[in-house]
Amino acid sequence: WKNDIKNQCTYVAEEDGIILGIFAFQTTPDISYYEIEGEWISAGPYAAMHRVCVAEEAKGKGVAGKMFAHGFRMAETLGFSSVRIDTHPGNIPMQRALGKAGFERCGEIHLAGGPEKGSLRIGFEKIL
């Protein structure tokens, strides 16, 4: 999160001054998405959303869906044709939220850098 804040790509969902959720929005190609065991839907330019988190007390209240919708609007405004995201294979609640938001499962990726380099993730994409 420190790098996300430093790079000014962190967005917060809040209500009455209470933080309900947070996500990172990336407009540069994600090196972890260069190779996929599967196939991305689009070869066009994409934005990426990362580290989508909803506060425990806000879960089940549509916060994730609203954050995804905001990310989609930002991506469209910036001229992107799709949004990509990834999650852990065991993160079933996030996979359900992604499906509900219109993301399609595209295949498996491995993180290309950072402390979890090489870790398996499931890649999703939504065409805007």
Would you name each region that the model predicts?
Residues 68, 75-87:
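Conserved GNAT acetyl-CoA-binding A-motif
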